């Protein structure tokens, strides 16, 4: 009888603890991915600064335009922003996709923990200014895509403009860091 009471109490305690622990793990994965997105942002911006000051920015911008995907094709103000993506597991491969090779080139020198590059990464770069616009970092998906792209996107996360809010990204554990988040802290109108 006493064993049944103890087992009943343990079942109740586990019933309360397991969902809380699961939510904590989910939140910690999201925060880690957000932190990694910021790290990728800073590394990519450092690399782009090196290319701009080194005089080879025009060649890199042309490569980004040819290999990348236009992030906002319907927004006239953001026509010059192109996305470069690296799929999970692609970093360790000898041959990478065109934009995956560019992501590797931009991040490889400034990222010391190379295991961070084994994720779905998207760098959005403004080819007019030569600045990084935003970075997505996901470990719980097979890739990142835009809704205007054709193809099979099973297991991938959509990264359109309306999917960038905190709650949507938290549900998917998708890390994100953007110049809009850092530059527009105060409304000066």
Residue ranges of each PLM-predicted region?
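Alpha-helix exit/C-cap motif
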Residues: 42-70
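Small side chains
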Residues: 8, 20, 44, 120-123
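Short, surface-exposed interaction loops/tails
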Residues: 113-189
């Amino acid at each position: 009888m006493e064993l049944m009471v103890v087992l009943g109490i343990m079942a109740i305690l586990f019933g309360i603890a397991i969902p809380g622990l699961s939510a904590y793990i989910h939140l910690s994965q999201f925060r880690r991915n957000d932190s990694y997105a910021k790290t990728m942002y800073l590394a990519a911006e450092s690399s782009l600064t090196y290319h701009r000051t080194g005089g080879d920015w025009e060649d890199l911008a042309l490569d980004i335009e040819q290999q990348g995907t236009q992030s906002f094709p319907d927004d006239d103000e953001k026509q010059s922003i192109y996305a470069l993506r690296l799929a999970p597991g692609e970093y360790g491969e000898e041959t990478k996709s065109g934009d995956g090779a560019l992501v590797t080139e931009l991040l490889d020198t400034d990222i010391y923990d190379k295991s961070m590059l084994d994720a779905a990464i998207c760098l959005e770069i403004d080819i007019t200014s030569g600045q990084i616009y935003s970075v997505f970092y996901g470990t719980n998906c097979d890739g990142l895509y835009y809704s205007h792209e054709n193809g099979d996107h099973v297991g991938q996360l959509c990264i359109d403009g309306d999917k960038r809010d905190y709650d949507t990204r938290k549900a998917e554990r998708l890390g994100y860091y953007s110049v809009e988040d850092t530059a527009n802290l105060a409304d000066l109108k």
